[in-house]
Regions:
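Acidic helix-start/capping segments at beta-turn-to-alpha-helix junctions
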Residues: 49-70, 121-125, 135-138, 237-245
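Acidic, glycine-anchored loop motifs typical of Ca2+
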Residues: 199-208
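Bacterial N-terminal signal peptides
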Residues: 6-17
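An acidic, Gly/Ser/Thr/Pro-rich helix-cap/linker signature
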Residues: 23-107
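Secretory-pathway/luminal and periplasmic proteins that interact with or process carbohydrate-rich
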Residues: 58-65, 125-135, 146-151, 167-173, ...
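Substrate-binding/active-site groove segments that recognize
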Residues: 136-146, 183-198, 219
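Short, functionally critical alpha-helical segments immediately adjacent to catalytic or ligand/cofactor-binding
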Residues: 50-58, 113-128, 161-162, 219-220
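C-terminal soluble interaction/assembly domains
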Residues: 241-331
């Protein structure tokens, strides 16, 4: 073999090795901090953690995806069409009928309507059909160590997935999920799994990945723990006067918490189309249509839905899908 070709091949191999090494995290300084903390605080074996991070890979596709979430890049009428369509409704009715007994039990035990539970699972994963194609360890490592805007959050979730994997006897490299590290039918983050996931079929296993019954109970428990109020109105369509100031409408996640009363919104020109308690706290929302806007007042239970995903458009899709399913399923 000519010397020149040998040199090219050797350099190519070295470059490939260096590139692969750069895409792993075992030598990453931030990963070393996580390793140290897990060893000291949680009793992990250092060598096992080093081996895990040596296999964890940086994924640029994850960084690209989190920079362009649909709820931030699409107007309401396009975003809504992703989740409110005949296919998703048909699949939801099928799921509802298949697990009717378990859904009824969840509604009785947790006070959360069955249609809300099904709608969450439908919006999140098309009822388990699309639960994510990324290794969770890759997603959370990439976002913890290479996405500074939310590094603290994803670092915490990375620790949580390693803890739950150890505690549940699961290989952390086997867990699959979304680009953000969400897992299973209901797309629970690792901390949500540890805090809210439950064994709802009494088989002594908490399996939100393959067991829709556990997923049903876990979603219901999540909502109960976040303050769902049984029987209360979730949201009302509204009208808005031309004089209504733009500042009162939800613009970002910090605006989702209800701080004004229905009466105060009415005084500003945003009036509910159904009768509401004038003293109830609400949020006003303005969603873009192809022509013009539609207006809504979200109440306490609407806010609870946004605890699952901090987006008004997301919560509205969940609510509207739930109502479409309830209208089609005989109870």
């Amino acid at each position: 073999m000519p010397l020149r070709l040998k040199i090219i091949l050797v350099m190519s191999c070295l470059w490939t090795a260096l590139s692969c090494a750069a895409d792993n995290y075992d030598a990453n300084p931030s990963a070393q901090v996580v390793i140290d903390e897990l060893v000291v605080e949680e009793g992990f074996d250092r060598e096992q953690l080093i081996a895990i991070f040596a296999q964890a890979e940086r994924k640029d596709s994850i960084l690209n995806a989190i920079a362009r979430p649909a709820e931030k890049t699409k107007p309401w009428y396009e975003y809504r069409a992703i989740f409110l369509n005949d296919k998703r409704e048909d699949q939801g009715v099928e799921f509802f009928n298949r697990y009717r007994m378990e859904l009824d039990r969840a509604e009785r035990e947790f006070g959360v309507p069955a249609e809300i539970i099904v709608a969450i699972i439908g919006v999140e994963t098309s009822y388990g059909r699309v639960a994510g194609s990324y290794r969770v360890i890759d997603a959370l490592s990439t976002l913890a160590f290479d996405y500074p805007p939310r590094s603290p959050f994803f670092t915490s979730e990375l620790k949580n997935v390693l803890i739950l994997s150890r505690d549940q006897g699961i290989d952390p490299m086997s867990l699959m999920g979304s680009y953000a590290g969400a897992m299973g039918y209901g797309q629970f983050m690792p901390s949500s799994y540890r805090n809210y996931a439950i064994d709802f079929d009494n088989d002594d296993i908490v399996d939100i990945w393959n067991n829709p019954v556990d997923a049903i109970g876990s979603v219901a428990n999540y909502f109960k723990q976040h303050g769902w109020r049984t029987g209360e109105i979730v949201v009302s369509a509204a009208t808005a006067a031309k004089s209504t100031p733009e500042a009162i409408f939800v613009k970002n996640r910090k605006d989702l918490h209800p701080t004004r009363t229905v009466a105060q919104f009415a005084a500003e020109g945003v009036v509910a189309e159904i009768k509401l308690d004038p003293e109830a706290l609400a949020t006003a929302m303005k969603f873009e249509q192809k022509e013009g806007y539609e207006y809504w007042l979200g109440l306490h239970n609407f806010y609870v839905i946004t605890r699952y995903n901090h987006s008004a458009m997301y919560a509205m899709c969940v609510y509207q899908l739930s109502q479409a399913l309830a209208a089609r399923v005989a109870r």
